[in-house]
Amino acid sequence: MAHKKAGGSSRNGRDSAGRRLGVKKFGGERVVSGNIIVRQRGTKWHPGANVGIGVDHTLFALADGAVKFLTKDKGRSYVSVVIEQQTEAAE
């Protein structure tokens, strides 16, 4: 039996929704513990001081402070959270 697909049918026309990846908190921005700093696939950015990494390579703050991006050995980029010391005057 000869088979002929009906005309006008389209096999394409699908696309997946964007995954909303990227930097969520930029350098110098204040973060609190638990804030997501970067959503990524793989480790484009590596965790530095006071930054944790999730099973999906999401980087998040482990302490309150300011975000700092830096490049170290082998051209590897790191994200750290710099803790600001608060000097409270005792009255």
Curated annotation (Swiss-Prot):
For this protein, the record's PROSITE patterns field holds: RIBOSOMAL_L27 (PS00831)
- Which GO terms fall under molecular function for this chain's record? structural constituent of ribosome
InterPro entries, A to Z? Ribosomal_bL27, Ribosomal_bL27_CS
What's in the keyword line of the UniProt record?
Ribonucleoprotein, Ribosomal protein
Q: Where is this region: Disordered?
A: 1-22
Q: Which family does it belong to?
A: Belongs to the bacterial ribosomal protein bL27 family.
The protein's name is: Large ribosomal subunit protein bL27
Which organism was this protein described from?
A: Methylocella silvestris (strain DSM 15510 / CIP 108128 / LMG 27833 / NCIMB 13906 / BL2)
Q: Which gene encodes it?
A: rpmA
